[in-house]
Amino acid sequence: MSRLRAKLKNIACVVLLCTALALTYMVWSYTMGVSGMGLLRRAFGVEEQETALYPGYEEMSYATRAVTPLSCAVRAETGAGLYGTTDRETASACFEKMGAVLAEALETAEDPSPATSYQWRDALSGTMVFMDFGGKVPLAALARLMGAQPSESMQGAARYVVLAVEDGTAVLYYKSDDRTILRCRTEADAAYLISLAAEQTANGYRFAYEEDLADAREVLLLTPQTSVPEVTEHRVLDTSSESDYDRITKDVLEGFGFNAYMPRVYNESGGTRVYVEEERTLRVYADGHIAFQNPQEETAAGYAPDTEEQTARIAQAAQLAYGILSSYLGDAELFLLEAAYNEETERFCVRFGAECGGIRILGERRAVAVCEFFGGELETAYIDLVTFRRTGANTGIIPAAQALAAAPYTDGFGLYYRADGETVHAGWYVEKE
């Protein structure tokens, strides 16, 4: 009996020893490579999110909103009138309607070739859909956001896209500026495009070149409306109470992945408040500008992201920008201004602008949100906490012909809002890069 007890005791000791070793290994595996702050996050149930190559539904929905055109125009057939969208909402509805045939065009596009302004105008004069995205949208990323596999030919970016029917074939035209036009044949369903275009009723819109305006831009869309909304600009933090400031700051911190209750905080000159968590720094300036820094190792090497990674980075940036700004932009909406890789800095930069009623808002900084990625990591970001409100109707816009006659040049000429402090002026301006 004593021998049996001894054997059982030995077995129990071995089991306890193995259990202790297993628990030690589990704890070591769990904490390996994790800082003290990271362990505290885990203890409080706040797990850091790993960089995802394939964005989730929420990120994709934000990115899709960002690449919705600011305006669209549709012509049913040669000689027919033009249908134009009156704001971003109607442009979104038109874009959604044309989405399937556009996605098919992006998926089946052949190698692009240069086109002339005469070919561009011919395309606009026949059965077609015209889209102005407001910024330079990478076509491959646009295709992926629309659920399509982009053609290998779709490597560039475009602000203006036209899908036209020529000799029974759907042909894609696109341009990122006022000069370079590219054209490619596609296998998109031309008959379906014709049927969709026929559903739109002309509502008085015209392209400027149709009005015989001298040196008119081929992309300048003239509206029959005689007024545009008056818009005012307000800095979010200028009039916020202490409790509002704390709430806004909490939203911003959580938007950037900080634990709002744990970072180290100190003040700099000029009323700037600085939040530090590990290597990451967030500065909230008194005027409402937000600057985020997450320095990467100097020994790391950047690289040009492929189309999948570009789409993922755009989606990640869109989720961040919309998540922070959507509660404060007021009557304005974000749009993708640019998403491009800089070979010199080895950074992939995503910029968002603001529009109101489908009209771009120009300002000193051009972008209200900027995200810069090094490799797969968000390294720096800039957010402008600003609100735009419609306050009435502006009926003092001069005719386009007069504005064109007075313009120093036509590249970038269009109807914009220009933010100047608290005042936002609507008028004909030349957009500067």
Specify the residue positions occupied by each region the protein language model found:
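Zymogen propeptides/activation segments of proteases
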Residues: V14-L17, G156-R185, A190-L196, Q200, ...
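N-terminal Lys/Arg-rich, disordered targeting/topogenic segments
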Residues: M1-K7
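Preferential activation on post-signal-peptide N-terminal prodomains/segments
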Residues: V15-A312
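Exposed beta-strand-loop-beta-strand "reactive/processing" segments of non-cytosolic proteins
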Residues: R247-G288, Q293-N294, A332-V386, G414-E433
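Short low-polarity hydrophobic stretches
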Residues: A20-T24, I314-A321, V368-V370
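Short, non-transmembrane alpha-helical segments in secretory-pathway proteins
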Residues: D87-A109, H234-G257, A304-T345, F388-H425
